[in-house]
Amino acid sequence: MAFDLAARLAERRAADLYRQRPLLQSPQGPNVVVDGQPLLAFCSNDYLGLANHPEVIAAWQAGAERWGVGGGASHLVVGHSTPHHQVEEALAELTGRPRALLFSTGYMANLGAITALVGQGDTVLQDRLNHASLLDGGLLSGARFNRYLHNDAVSLANRLGKACGNTLVVTDGVFSMDGDLADLPALAEVARARGAWLMVDDAHGLGTLGAHGGGIVEHFGLGIDDVPVLIGTLGKACGTAGAFVAGSDDLIEALVQFARPYIYTTSQPPALACATLKSLELLRRETWRREHLAGLIRQFREGAVQIGLQLMDSPTPIQPILIGDSAQALRLSQMLRERGLLVTAIRPPTVPAGSARLRVTLSAAHSEAQVQLLLNALADCYPQLEAADA
């Protein structure tokens, strides 16, 4: 048989890299039911606790009553409704840019932006730890594709010296598996000096960073000249679904004309856009969510240091615990689950070989008492893991 899928699957299982989908049987939130088991979850990207917010739910319901439940067509045919347009205007205001353009997913936004902006004869330079969707966009663009050392402006400058054509520098804003921030001021300075554009995927920074939740660009006090192309997702801190690109009028018009993942897909349900409008309102108005989240991050990091956990340099809700071995990461995750805590083990190829980890994510919906429960369980389980490994 030409396609020996069984052998490929067996190989992955033997390497402790086999993935399975847990079945969520409750709404998103700290307390969930997964595969029939009540658990306290620390693995969702619902950073501000808006995914199950009653006002967001009510906005979706009212939107469905007013606009129906389907987009019906692509944006360029007859699928671009008033709620879609209102969300784009709200996102432009939040990010401080002239315009924004809605996409169905973050993956599609990244592929659409990169492939619309560069092609054969051009250059794409990406951080080596960028999200898979960014890397795929670079490969699919047909442009000359290269990666620079993680968060290293000197490495980027060296590669820019060899670039040809239009050059797009691409980085995550917050790196999804490490939680660290891109050094945008340094990257932007290098890119501008070489006439390149900087594109930032702020999937994990939007809503959590910046005084008004505008994300990593606001956090660093940068503007559109520093970061001409800004990507954001709506399924994380915003608690709904979808993504967007924000930038100049010319950028958005170019994407409408040339971004195939935008052109050739049906628009989101208008009711979803209504829900997103409400979540954006809450994101800006209820600043206590970011303040509470920042306190939980401090609490977790201080407690983890006392336990002796190996954390990464992350000031964000993403707090990975580095384990190294995939089997050990799975074992620690299972030990926590037996104590009623859900923390996902992240293994290669999502992260580099030898750097398997538990990816703890915190939410404004968590309480200090819940974070302490996690720390207590880690204090109990982690020494057992080390003892078994000795």
UniProtKB/Swiss-Prot annotation:
Functional pathway: Cofactor biosynthesis; biotin biosynthesis
This enzyme's EC code(s): 2.3.1.47
Keyword Nucleotide-binding: no
Listed cofactors: pyridoxal 5'-phosphate
Binding locations of substrate: R19, H131, T350
Residues with the N6-(pyridoxal phosphate)lysine modification: K236
GO molecular function: 8-amino-7-oxononanoate synthase activity; pyridoxal phosphate binding
InterPro entries with a match to the protein in the record: Aminotransferase_I/II_large, AON_synthase_class-II, AONS_Archaea/Proteobacteria, AONS_Proteobacteria, PyrdxlP-dep_Trfase, PyrdxlP-dep_Trfase_major, PyrdxlP-dep_Trfase_small
Keyword entries, A-Z: Biotin biosynthesis, Pyridoxal phosphate, Transferase
Residues annotated as signal peptide: none
GO biological process: biotin biosynthetic process
The keyword Transcription regulation is assigned to this record: no
Family the entry assigns: Belongs to the class-II pyridoxal-phosphate-dependent aminotransferase family. BioF subfamily.
Record's subunit section: Homodimer.
Protein's name in the database: 8-amino-7-oxononanoate synthase
Top-level taxonomy: Bacteria, Pseudomonadati, Pseudomonadota, Gammaproteobacteria, Pseudomonadales
